[in-house]
Amino acid sequence: MQRLLSGSLTICALALALPAAAQVEYPPVPVEKAAYHWPVFSNEHVMVLRVYFPPGRGSNYHIHSLDQISVQVEPGANAGQVWGEEPTPARPGTKGQVSFTAYSKKKFIHKSTNTAATPYQNIVIALLKPKPAGLAPAARPDGYVQVFDNERARGWKLALEPGQSVGPITQSAPGLRVVIDGGEIAEIVSGQPDRGLGLRLGDFYWQEPGTTRGIRNIGTTRIEIAEFELK
């Protein structure tokens, strides 16, 4: 009987210890090493991460230390916790939200978990150069809505209904396009045949400077994209 009681007490002690062991936190990692943060592209200018949290999933503690552009393409609802602080409650994201954060001036350490029944997806563009390279983005015509302009980059959003088009722009600095709502477009370059493109939510494209192009929605659904040029 005494041996049975002793064994039962040991099992209870182990059961109580398991939750504590499960909550052990490892040291923060660089953002590109965090769970559900996948590096998908890099060059001398940028590192692009696809952050994708299925429902109920999230990241471990990680460090943001590079200036960063973010585009939310699937909003989810993330609960977060800053390193050394109390957790913050979940709040729904906003599809299409574009943001810029100067993490090079003050690094940020946190973790987050998607509490929604739908996925969370964020395209993160980390700027690898520590300061501007002296590039100069040009102004864009009506249709492009500027969403930010600072010492590191300039950003716009463009939405087109089926059949709508936007006048040509000449891209004067390197940058990216991120797809918020997919569909079909034609890129129009003078002297060349129109180039049809199928856009998918969360797709991104690196774009070199020097091209003059217009865009027309040739599909049956509204498209929305964000475009950025570096400085």
Q: Which residues does each PLM region occupy?
A:
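Ligand-binding loop in jelly-roll beta-barrel domains
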Residues: 104-128, 182, 208-231
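Surface-exposed beta-loop interaction hotspot
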Residues: 103, 111-161
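Short acidic-glycine-tyrosine-enriched beta hairpin
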Residues: 84-104, 193-209
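Bacterial N-terminal signal peptides that target proteins for export
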Residues: 1-9
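Glycine- and acidic-residue-biased ligand/ion/polar-headgroup-sensing regions
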Residues: 65-84, 171-191
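Bacterial N-terminal signal peptides
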Residues: 8-19
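A short glycine-rich, His/Asp/Glu-containing loop-to-beta-strand
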Residues: 33-61, 65-73, 139-177, 227-228
